[in-house]
């Protein structure tokens, strides 16, 4: 699968714009979209405070899903449930659920109310995505894990560790998903799992509950290291893995023009990784397109600016390289005479 990531935490597109670019996504080779709603989802009830003033309405969400279906794009929703909780924990009414009082990034995994909060968010999103085969629960960059006072005390007890604390919250979230929605598989960013020893991973239930997404947005991947990481995850019990590249939003917090060459190299490197691991290992790749590095950050490249890069990257994945004939196809798709004119450098 080839999924385009829609990051809605900055300059979210209008539905009419999505109706124009979804056919392009499909024509370029995408067959799915990962929608990171953040505060653009129309949360209701006690979660209403999470929604932005310009959040999509339920009818607009349904229209987006309809447009995706028309263009044969499978939709995977994404809701952060551990790190990058700024849009939730910035609110005074929920600030007591922070791991560290000063920082709204990380959820306190010790409080029952924390799990109740994120499962309620999941449930509301799933209500509008009843047929979702996968659901992304985030869990990346949990920066302040273990630094709260409750965590410090807990970590002083043997055999507790940050890895155990991390895995226990992941397991709780994923267990809710599996129990409540048995036909939906949770996805999870892999960075918090990378340094956890294989025996600790296999000793938890996480490998039976989720499919990790290995992300790396660099132009020069450690190919051998990636192969070793894949092997470690497989030995730990994960049945399927995903990859995540970037077509924009990964080369600078205030980047305004997309360096296409960087992102093309990133995808060509991921093709090498895919070719070096067993065929039944990677289920698909998510082409991320970040709008902001976090909820409080400035905007990086906007989605329309990143479309040429997305076209290059999708076509490279589809054809397995970026030869002259593939380049010509992209130029034809975009209606431009030369891609070189669009290879901006900051």
UniProtKB/Swiss-Prot annotation:
Pfam families: Glyco_hydro_20. Its EC number is 3.2.1.52. Its main location: cytoplasm. GO terms for biological process: carbohydrate metabolic process. GO terms for molecular function: beta-N-acetylhexosaminidase activity; hexosaminidase activity. It catalyses: Hydrolysis of terminal non-reducing N-acetyl-D-hexosamine residues in N-acetyl-beta-D-hexosaminides. InterPro entries: Glyco_hydro_20_cat, Glycoside_hydrolase_SF, HEXDC-like. GO terms for cellular component: cytoplasm; extracellular vesicle; nucleus. Inhibited by O-(2-acetamido-2-deoxy-D-glucopyranosylidene)amino N-phenylcarbamate (PUGNAc). Inhibited by galacto-NAG-thiazoline. Keywords: Cytoplasm, Disulfide bond, Glycosidase, Hydrolase, Nucleus. This is Hexosaminidase D. The gene is HEXD.
């Amino acid at each position: 699968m080839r999924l385009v990531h829609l990051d809605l935490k900055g300059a979210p597109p209008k539905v009419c714009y999505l109706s124009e670019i979804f056919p392009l996504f499909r024509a370029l080779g995408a067959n799915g979209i990962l929608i990171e709603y953040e505060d653009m989802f129309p949360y209701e009830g006690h979660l209403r405070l999470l929604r932005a003033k310009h959040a999509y309405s339920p009818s607009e969400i349904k229209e987006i899903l309809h447009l995706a279906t028309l263009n044969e794009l499978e939709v995977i929703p994404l809701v952060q449930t551990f790190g990058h909780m700024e849009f939730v924990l910035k609110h005074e009414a929920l600030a007591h659920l922070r791991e560290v009082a000063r920082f709204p990034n990380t959820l306190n995994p010790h409080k029952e109310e924390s799990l109740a909060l994120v499962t309620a968010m999941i449930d509301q999103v799933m209500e509008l995505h009843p047929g979702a085969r996968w659901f992304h629960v985030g869990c990346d960059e949990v920066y302040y894990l273990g630094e709260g006072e409750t965590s410090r005390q807990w970590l002083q007890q043997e055999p507790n560790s940050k890895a155990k604390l991390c895995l226990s919250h992941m397991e709780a979230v994923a267990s809710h998903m599996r129990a409540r929605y048995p036909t939906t598989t949770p996805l999870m960013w892999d960075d918090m799992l990378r340094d956890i020893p294989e025996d600790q991973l296999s000793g938890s239930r996480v490998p039976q509950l989720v499919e990790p997404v290995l992300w790396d947005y660099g132009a020069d991947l450690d190919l051998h290291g990636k192969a070793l990481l894949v092997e470690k995850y497989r030995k730990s019990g994960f049945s399927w893995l995903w990859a995540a590249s970037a077509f924009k939003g990964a080369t600078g917090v205030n980047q305004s023009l997309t360096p296409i060459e960087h992102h093309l190299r990133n995808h060509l490197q991921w093709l090498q990784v895919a070719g070096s691991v067993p065929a039944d290992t990677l289920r698909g790749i998510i082409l991320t397109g970040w709008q902001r590095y976090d909820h409080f950050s400035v905007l990086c490249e906007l989605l329309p600016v990143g479309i040429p890069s997305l076209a290059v990257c999708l076509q490279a994945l589809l054809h397995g390289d970026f030869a002259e004939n593939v380049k010509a196809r992209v130029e034809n798709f975009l209606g431009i005479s030369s891609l070189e004119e669009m290879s901006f450098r900051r």
